[in-house]
């Protein structure tokens, strides 16, 4: 009985405490105001952007959400209901929603799971039920839910609460968790939202974009139809990267099954940018029915000649073979900074994450009071027992130290300090070593990203992360297609490349990529005689054996069910007889 009750409780928890809105079966596609306009939004811009989404061909390509980010709201009325900013939206939000719907589009809004939004407008914490009621009344289709001013309350409390309130309205609303990747959100968010941010905010630069997709990649196993890893919105068209880099940006988001939310001014978009954003074959990979997130399967470190030493860059930290380059030189300073090559980049815990977090180098801001934790996320101590220990305070009172991730054995993260977290710091050559390898900012490399598609096909993106031209190669045995012939198609050029027996290689310029779709060429089976009478007899024997075995399994299952039912009834009858006996004794 206890086992049965436990099973019922688990089933009830899954059924009644999960997101069940039927949305997000494929990564969402649309446009968002934030990356380009920040708070500079108004109803004219939104109206014009609805028109532009249609006239530019973006809707035909699959983009169907128009999403207002922060600053559409102002404060609350006396009853606690959210009010729109009537200075910038004098006619309110509902007319814009109706206009979008009349054009076949969907409409989204933004809030934060805190007292305030990130720009200081009224947040939704403690007002979840009222806000969900308003969103449903306005016929909203999408909610981006941020993480600012959260009072230190766990995301596992705040985000499910809004989910439940949205569900209670009976109005399907796509629920996008903008939670910055904290508290290992990817491991639990599929029961809460339709997508979840795995990282901090993106900016319009190559370094930011490539570091963010690296961080997103580690969670690839948790994405799939109904819920997606979100490395933030697209920066394509905002001017901070080259067209080549934007093409790679789009390819990486597509193969990673990331949400495709345009972040540029679509009312003033160049043909080159539109060509990237509307590439139908890239988008088809992103929207593939299988919904399997592609991920990094191969990384080849570039072996530069001794006389070439690339400049250090803001990036994740990793453990690599020692080579004496600047990327492997570190200075531990009295102010707590751990500086790469003693320059302006410091080892940083992004967003002061309180759980195990991948660390990176970031612009030094030691002592800056306006940064999270008053910049303690960039302060470290090299202890007597050879640990690199963060000066940040953690809720459990325990300290965190740098260590190498157990899954990758190369990526460096914070973790509870223990005996395995030791590092050797050499004050002469300024290397920091673990197990004979050197701590480094992520060195330049070539990579292959890949993933399965529906109908047995395969997607591959070959990438050159280096600042110099490089050759990138992939062998079929590295992706499980030993002794196979693959038919390859270039998705950018939208043309077939032919058949390749063992491998494929390509020379790529700096930050360029080639996006491929691969299909296995099946060998033509040799001609054989049709099955004769003896073969038919053998086939019938096999079929009979299978049917007998299947019947036995079904009979066992039915027997178990009947047994559990009889046992349950006997238990109840026994309880009833005992109750009747007690009543009779009391009456006597």
Q: Model features per residue range: what roles?
A:
Residues 553-568:
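Single-pass type I membrane-protein transmembrane alpha-helix
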Residues 127-130, 168-265, 452:
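Glycan-recognition surfaces
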Residues 570-588:
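Cytoplasmic C-terminal tails of single-pass
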Residues 499-529:
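C-terminal beta-strand-rich structural cap/linker in extracellular carbohydrate-active enzymes
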Residues 529-550:
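Extracellular juxtamembrane-to-transmembrane boundary of type I single-pass membrane glycoproteins
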Residues 253-263, 443-481:
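Carbohydrate-binding surface patches
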Residues 296-445:
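Lectin-like carbohydrate-binding module/patch detector with strong preference for beta-trefoil
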Residues 49-152:
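Aromatic-lined carbohydrate-binding/catalytic grooves of carbohydrate-active enzymes
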